[in-house]
Amino acid sequence: PMGMTQPLSHSNQMPSPNAMGPNIPPHGVPMGPGLMSHNPIMGHGSQEPPMVPQGRMGFPQGFPPVQSPPQQVPFPHNGPSGGQGNFPGGMGFPGEGPLGRPSNLPQSSADAALCKPGGPGGPDSFAVLG
């Protein structure tokens, strides 16, 4: 038990001590399925271009599409970025000021981020990031 707990703890802390540690549980849940869903979505990315523009223009106002684009942005960013600073810092800071204001996606991104991790990840991830 102890040996397992330590490796697990180190495993989570290895990626990131605090940022990823707490973020992994909340984000891990949506990330797992999200990444899988995004995998196909990313692959379809080439075919989605037509849908992306449409979804962005008309969907951002809608609910389902809004969560899809934002989800794709934060999750994929988090994966490739490895939670460097784009996801943590980008979500709170850029999402609110530079990115959130000028961009429509950031706006929905904040919504999706709040809605997705909402209870478990929302406050936790925000508090940790902040």
Swiss-Prot record:
Where is it mostly found? Answer: nucleus
Q: Which InterPro entries match?
A: Bcl-9/Bcl-9l
Example of a GO MF term: beta-catenin binding
Single GO cellular component annotation? nucleus
Q: Which residues form a coiled coil?
A: none
Q: A Gene Ontology biological process annotation? A: canonical Wnt signaling pathway
Q: Where is this region: Disordered?
A: 1-130
- Where in the sequence does UniProt note compositional bias of the Gly residues kind? 80-98
Q: What does this protein do?
A: Involved in signal transduction through the Wnt pathway. Promotes beta-catenin's transcriptional activity.
| Assembly mode | Binds to beta-catenin (CTNNB1), PYGO1 and PYGO2; the interaction with PYGO1 increases PYGO1 affinity to histone H3 methylated at 'Lys 4'.
Q: Identify this protein by name.
A: B-cell CLL/lymphoma 9 protein
The record lists the organism as Sus scrofa (Pig)
